[in-house]
Amino acid sequence: MGQKVNPHGLRVGVIKDWDSRWFATDKKEFGNLLLEDHNIRKFLKKRLYSAGVAKIEIERSANKIKMDLHVAKPGVVIGRAGAGIEALKAELEKMTKKTIIVNIVEVRSTDKNAQLVAENIALAIERRVAFRRAMKQAIQRAMKSGAKGIKVSASGRLGGAEMARTEGYSEGNVPLQTLRADIDYGFAEADTTYGKIGIKVWICNGEVLPTRDGVNPREESRKSDRRDNKRDNRRNDRRGNDRRGNDNRGNYRGQRPQGGSRPQRTENKGN
């Protein structure tokens, strides 16, 4: 049975970049650094849950770790006079034994970020809001914010049912197999009294053309539009000719031949 691949991983190297950027000398070091990245992300998601963490980017050098935290509420992370971010850096340095550099990046439109939308839906379900209402409200807010399309899926014991199931809603266009489509994906879990409910969100923010040397993406899109228009015109012309030809073939029967006289009918009369 076919399954859906992670949209971000499918587009890495095409229109998206890696969330972790570093090199390892051998397999053992690679495993240690990968586990350390996982622990850092797990710690930050739990520590800064109220700030709305959308994405964590990690870069490494010799003994330094640079982190870019994309959050919805930067003030919660920074704290009064920068006290919050200094305490956060101290905790991370104690955990990793390395120098930590933290950059805070504000997420402008939270309704178009798939991870934040999924977490908001999960939080609403934990507050006993009907899951259908929470999903539909999130879809409406995303479309009003300018998203090209959105798809939401909820799995688990929805509404406290005995048997788990999956329900989803979608609006607009979400082309998962189009690599140039900017698809944002988010996942969150809602902890309820009758078990966990998984929330998946796909948001399409339009198409992104890969930049190439000497090619302007806008010019390339205009050229492709002109080519598509010419192709459609040629296709319509062919269809029109075929349609006219079919009409002529259908109306040929019963018509009088052009340019000649009607043949005379002869009758044989007996003497």
Swiss-Prot record:
Domain of life here?
A: Bacteria
Domain KH type-2, by residue range, is 40-108
InterPro entries in the cross-refs: KH_dom (IPR004087), KH_dom-like_a/b (IPR015946), KH_dom_type_2 (IPR004044), KH_sf_prok-type (IPR009019), Ribosomal_S3_C_sf (IPR036419), Ribosomal_uS3_bac-typ (IPR005704), Ribosomal_uS3_C (IPR001351), Ribosomal_uS3_CS (IPR018280)
User: Which Gene Ontology molecular function entries are recorded, alphabetically?
Assistant: mRNA binding; rRNA binding; structural constituent of ribosome
Q: Which residue ranges are recorded for the region named Disordered?
A: 210-271
Q: Name one GO cellular component term.
A: cytosolic small ribosomal subunit
Q: Which GO terms describe its biological process?
A: translation
Which CDD domains does the record cross-reference, listed alphabetically? KH-II_30S_S3 (cd02412)
What Gene3D superfamilies has UniProt attached to this entry? 3.30.300.20, Ribosomal protein S3, C-terminal domain
Question: Mind listing the UniProt keywords for this protein, alphabetically?
Answer: Ribonucleoprotein, Ribosomal protein, RNA-binding, rRNA-binding
One Pfam family linked to the record = KH_2
Q: What is this protein called?
A: Small ribosomal subunit protein uS3
Source species, please? Answer: Clostridioides difficile (strain 630) (Peptoclostridium difficile)
Organism lineage reads as: Bacteria, Bacillati, Bacillota, Clostridia, Peptostreptococcales
Its gene is rpsC
